[in-house]
Amino acid sequence: MKERLEAFLKGAIAGLQGPMRMEPIAGGQSNPTFFVDFDNRSLVLRKQPEANLLPSAHAVDREFRVMQALAATDVPVPKMLLFHADRDVVGTPFYMMERLQGRVFPHYALPGMAAAKRLEIYLAMAATMARLHKVDWAAIGLSDFGRHGGYFSRQIARWTKQWQTARTRESADVERLIAWLPKNLPDEAETSISHGDFRLGNLMFHPTEPRVVGVLDWELSTLGHPLADVAFNCIAHHTLPAEYGGIRGLDLAALGIPAEDDYLKHYYAKSGRTDGVSAFHFAFALFRMAVIFEGIAVRAASGNAAAGNAAEVGALSSAFAKRGVEFVND
């Protein structure tokens, strides 16, 4: 594969010099990602996995398209270089982008950082999310990137189907959420670009400044509802450190991390919103994550997961479903 890829890239991207070096990027659960370096240029390759067990997943073409469109906005994204749909080079469709230089923080608690710096990181995250949701998606050619309105109804149906397709067990908590969510739908008329996985670990920050230089991992992006992103972005406030690195139960004031209400107020101020997230939005976000974790467990069982801890992460499905039920009022 490496030899084919090197020959392809040198033919498709002008000026690449020296032998190609390729290194897998650890930590991802979905689309395999690699650093691809030449003597004079550092790139990133992102591809579909060899197998695709879940419908509509691993859409690298959509990732490429939305980031290419956002290049014309104030939302920071890597520069897209090419998309290759055929399987003749690396076995599955893939795209190439410029490699950004900066810091990625996988843990919401931001260990080893001064309290004042933690606050700056959180406020930058909220401001970046607000910029995304204010983008005129029609003006940048994304009118057909998803349906307009009715986002939560469609998403509940989608993730319910994913659960029924992928589940390896029964879950009373998931079934309770499947029953409750459609009966408690909020207004669905609003439409924005929805990242679908807007969390701290999918942001790259400037090497020294509290500034986002790249929003990464757009696999789940679509035209959706901004409050879906907002609720998902706040999941860490509702989950324990052992539950995928949540911050529930930590002394947030001592850490310099804003309480959820303060964090949301900052987002609302930057986005110009007058309404906010509700119990429904949090329950939906946790339900969706429970189904995603179950899908990771399925891929782990088949040996087709990008990260080595996929079996462990898949076990979190039960924990997130339980947290989702905490928002259910029958």
Predicted regions and their residues:
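Catalytic-loop of the protein kinase fold
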Residues: 193-195, 200
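All-alpha amphipathic helical-bundle segments outside canonical DNA-binding/catalytic cores
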Residues: 146-147, 273-285
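ATP-binding pocket architecture of kinase catalytic cores
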Residues: 19-193, 207-209
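Helical subdomain adjoining the active site within ATP-dependent kinase catalytic cores
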Residues: 273-277, 291-330
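Hydrophobic residue at the +6 position relative to the catalytic HRD Asp in the kinase catalytic loop
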Residues: 203-205
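Active-site activation/catalytic loop segments of kinase-like enzymes and analogous catalytic loops
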Residues: 228-271, 285-303
